[in-house]
Amino acid sequence: MKNSSKIFVVLSIILFYVISSCHGYNPFAKTVVTVTNNISPQTTLTISCRSKDDDLGEHLLLHGQAFLWKFRPSWFRTTLFTCKFLWNNNVKWFDTYRSDRDQGHCYSCNWSINADSACISGNFNKKFDRCYPWN
């Protein structure tokens, strides 16, 4: 019985990994989120991002500059990173990574921050074709 239990556990783990990989989700891979300031050439963007577990600090981005971080999403699809954006007299908030929206769709999440929205191009797509209004 002991050997059959071990074999069952090993086969279950392998099956989970194979099914997850077939659906575009690798539970062991790190996700990269990149946020780029594309507001206007003379605008400096202050960005401050955090999750429940991590505070990534405050960063100043000149036009065209980017800030990125890497992490492993939770297997339970609860990972959430929220960023606060400040420029001129504007203060905006946005979820730059939400497991329910992004996990399995974007391992390299590239955000273009504009004055009226945040736009994403996922993985190898270079077009910022999905835009979301500010929270």
From Swiss-Prot:
Q: Does the keyword Ligase apply?
A: no
Question: Where does it sit, as one GO cellular component term?
Answer: extracellular region
Positions glycosylated per UniProt: 110
Q: Which GO terms describe its biological process?
A: rejection of self pollen
* UniProt keyword Magnesium present: no
Q: Which pairs of Cys residues are joined through disulfide bonds in the record? A: none
InterPro entries hit by this protein: Self-incomp_S1
Q: Where is this chain primarily localised?
A: secreted
Q: Using the record, list the residue span of the signal peptide; answer none if the entry has no such feature.
A: 1-24
The UniProt keyword set, sorted, is: Glycoprotein, Secreted, Self-incompatibility, Signal
User: Where is the protein found, in the record's own terms?
Assistant: Secreted
Q: Which family does it belong to?
A: Belongs to the plant self-incompatibility (S1) protein family.
Name recorded for this polypeptide: S-protein homolog 29
| Organism (species) | Arabidopsis thaliana
Per the record, the gene is SPH29
